[in-house]
């Protein structure tokens, strides 16, 4: 009898405990689930999400962005130079070999990658995902401009080397100041007529607003039932589940409220924030990397008369003793519906990894595993350290004098200094040197192929489409080979799997079709037979120089 009384007495308590246990179990079982978690609301995640939505539309995708909206960090038009990087004018992609010849290998690689991006954007216009091409891409001639005997000789050889390739046809070269003035009057007016100069000019260059592309891609994804965007939300923790999927904690940056999501696959495309997130995952591959932040500032003119006279992007040569990352350029831009002109970049230093980041970013990503590689890089690249110190010490007058080298008649009152985005350069462990600056961008994946992170800064947004396809290839090797996915990829990028260089007909077709769809200037007709792809028969020039691909 007493046992029955005890049981009745405690029944409500037992019921409450049972309810709490079952509720907890239910909550655990109802954790939000997604096939793909995209961390970061920039051009990289937007591009990857778009490709995945096309090849596997039934997959659920969740995009998480720390700021109040997408494309507010590095993808924002004011936080980058807006160049469609295709190596038409960027001299650091065509270094001089020891024997004096020009190595165009990297230039071809960059150009091929950008043509994939052009086809990707073109296919999105045809699908109605991207609208009004002029809102995000505009024809802008690309020019290289140098002065002095040595630089003129170099540019002459560079032009001759590029003329042996298919992808750089239509380029023109001149050492005549009057001809160059017709291409870009502002860089010649007021210049000593006796100064020895040289320039190349090509009509196939572009100015790209990567922020606008990002906003439109995400806007289209939001219209699909399987895509969800969470802004003002930060990923704060990762735990690997038994099935190798990821249990990810997401925190509302305003309220502090947490919720979790189970994701089969994770992509960390958070720009400067990617390294810290990669370290949080705990995967051993993260131990191989460190990051060093370099910011950039630009002089900008919104004077309509200056913008009217300068409709090109003009890239110069780095000064003697300065690393190639310091190449100055005078850029025609189309931002927020108006034409402006930018000059720079001038390197700045901050311990932040993001423009909207924390001053503790550098310290918080420095670990016992990557401290020595960072030290080794500093010791091995003293010219870079000296350059950065010199840049930080520049006065307003110094910056204006640098502008006048490219625009001799510039007036101070027409220009103001703006701070652009942060670029985190990769430092990777090296068995011989301890640590090296890693060129370009790098995709880091775990052994289980359920997580990928994108590190690095150059050439950046220009290659968002090929990088997205490469991420898919690495995470989903079997599906990638399937005819279903290959067929979809060829719809997105018709030339996928084929090299353009050396194939005149295909190059012309891609040029013409993308130009028509994107409403760009009609490309020149390629006047050459099928060419042999350039071969690096000699040792690549300055392959050991780690600063060639560093980005501001």
Swiss-Prot record:
Gene3D superfamilies: D-Amino Acid Oxidase, subunit A, domain 2 (3.30.9.10), FAD/NAD(P)-binding domain (3.50.50.60)
Sequence segments annotated as region (Disordered): 530-552
Pfam (any one): Mqo
One of the protein's GO biological processes: tricarboxylic acid cycle
One of the record's GO molecular function terms: L-malate dehydrogenase (quinone) activity
Catalytic activity: (S)-malate + a quinone = a quinol + oxaloacetate
Stored SUPFAM superfamilies: FAD/NAD(P)-binding domain
Residue spans of biased composition, Polar residues class: 542-552
Family to which the UniProt record says this protein belongs: Belongs to the MQO family.
HAMAP family attached to this UniProt entry: MQO (MF_00212)
Protein name: Probable malate:quinone oxidoreductase
UniProt organism field: Cronobacter sakazakii (strain ATCC BAA-894)
């Amino acid at each position: 009898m007493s046992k029955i009384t005890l049981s009745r007495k405690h029944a409500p308590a037992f019921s409450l405990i049972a309810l709490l246990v079952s509720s907890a179990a239910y909550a655990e079982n109802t954790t939000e689930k997604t096939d793909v978690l995209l961390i970061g609301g920039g051009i990289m995640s937007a591009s990857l999400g778009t490709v995945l939505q096309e090849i596997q539309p039934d997959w659920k995708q969740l995009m998480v962005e720390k700021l109040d909206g997408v494309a507010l960090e590095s993808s924002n038009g004011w936080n980058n130079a807006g160049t469609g990087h295709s190596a038409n004018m960027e001299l650091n992609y065509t270094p001089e070999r020891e024997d004096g010849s020009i190595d165009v290998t990297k230039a071809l690689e960059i150009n091929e990658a950008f043509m994939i991006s052009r086809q990707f954007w073109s296919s999105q216009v045809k699908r109605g995902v991207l609208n009004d091409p002029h809102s995000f891409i505009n024809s802008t001639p690309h020019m290289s401009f140098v002065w002095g005997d040595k630089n003129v000789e170099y540019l002459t050889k560079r032009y001759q080397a590029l003329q042996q390739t298919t992808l750089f046809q239509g380029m023109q070269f001149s050492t005549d100041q009057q001809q160059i003035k017709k291409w870009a009057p502002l860089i010649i007016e007021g210049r000593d007529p006796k100064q020895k100069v040289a320039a190349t000019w090509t009509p196939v260059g572009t100015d790209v607003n990567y922020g606008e592309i990002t906003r439109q891609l995400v806007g289209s994804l939001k219209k699909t039932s399987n895509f969800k965007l969470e802004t003002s939300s930060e990923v704060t923790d990762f735990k690997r589940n038994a099935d190798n999927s990821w249990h990810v904690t997401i925190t509302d940056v305003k309220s502090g409220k947490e919720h979790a999501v189970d994701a089969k696959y994770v992509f960390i495309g958070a720009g400067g924030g990617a390294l810290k997130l990669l370290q949080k995952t705990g995967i051993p591959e993260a131990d191989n990397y460190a990051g060093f932040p370099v910011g950039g500032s630009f002089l900008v003119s919104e004077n309509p008369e200056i913008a009217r006279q300068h409709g090109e992007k003009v890239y110069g040569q780095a000064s003697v003793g300065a690393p190639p990352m310091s190449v100055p350029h005078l850029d025609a831009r189309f931002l927020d519906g108006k034409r402006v002109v930018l000059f720079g970049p001038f390197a700045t230093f901050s311990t932040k990894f993001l423009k909207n980041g924390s001053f503790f970013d550098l310290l918080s990503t420095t670990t016992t595993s990557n401290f020595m590689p960072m030290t080794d890089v500093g010791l091995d690249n003293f010219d870079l350290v000296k350059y950065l110190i010199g840049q930080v010490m520049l006065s307003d007058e110094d910056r204006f004098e640098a502008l006048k080298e490219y625009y001799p008649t510039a007036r101070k009152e027409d220009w103001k200094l703006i701070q652009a985005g942060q670029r985190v350069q990769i430092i990777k462990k090296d068995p011989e040197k301890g640590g090296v600056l890693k060129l370009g961008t790098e995709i880091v994946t775990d052994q289980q192929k359920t997580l990928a992170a994108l590190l690095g800064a150059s050439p950046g947004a220009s290659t968002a489409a090929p990088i997205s396809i490469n991420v898919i290839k690495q995470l989903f090797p079997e599906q990638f080979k399937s005819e279903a996915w290959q067929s979809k990829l060829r719809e997105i990028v018709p030339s996928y799997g084929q090299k353009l260089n050396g194939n005149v007909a295909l190059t012309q077709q891609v040029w013409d079709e993308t130009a028509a769809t994107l409403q760009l200037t009609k490309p020149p007709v390629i006047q050459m037979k099928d060419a042999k792809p350039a071969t690096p028969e000699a040792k690549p020039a300055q392959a050991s120089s780690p600063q060639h691909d560093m980005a501001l």
